[in-house]
């Protein structure tokens, strides 16, 4: 998944926080940035569409409620995936095959992987 510089900066704030954040939390935690509220809103919606973040709940923000967000993957997983996908598009399948061909991939491990795949396919 290709992210813009601003989207990566939003993700960095979220990854460093380690807790669900609201739009106003992003503004507070990004003091070095001069993002406008509307810019953060646009970036969060873009990250939602790309599947990088998910809604985690609601919090009361003054008189209204605001959504909170969590990342759908760790920073490490994002950068490894992005590096493979960018340079070697079929690399994901090759990596999976290499991992599955290892002797450590016993039947119990393969069953767990199958369960994860089945859940993902729903």
Feature-to-residue mapping (PLM):
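Amphipathic alpha-helical dimerization/coiled-coil segments
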Residues: 76-122
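Short acidic, hydrophobic short linear motifs in intrinsically disordered regions
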Residues: 20-30
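Basic amphipathic alpha-helical segments that dock to polyanions
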Residues: 10, 41-50
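A short, conserved structural fragment
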Residues: 48-60
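Short, cationic-aromatic polyanion-contact patches
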Residues: 4, 58-80
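Short alpha-helical segments that sit at the start of domains
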Residues: 1-13, 17, 74-75, 85-89, ...
């Amino acid at each position: 998944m290709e992210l813009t510089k601003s989207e990566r900066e939003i993700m960095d704030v979220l990854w460093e926080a380690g807790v669900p954040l609201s739009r106003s939390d992003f503004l507070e935690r990004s003091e070095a940035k001069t993002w406008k509220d509307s810019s953060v809103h646009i970036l969060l919606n873009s990250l939602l569409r790309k599947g990088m973040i998910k809604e985690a709940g609601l919090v009361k923000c003054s008189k209204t409620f605001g959504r909170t967000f969590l990342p759908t993957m760790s920073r490490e997983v994002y950068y490894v995936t992005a590096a493979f996908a960018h340079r070697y598009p079929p690399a994901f399948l090759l990596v999976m095959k290499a991992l599955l061909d290892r002797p450590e991939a016993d039947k119990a491990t393969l069953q767990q992987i199958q369960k994860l795949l089945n859940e993902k396919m729903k």
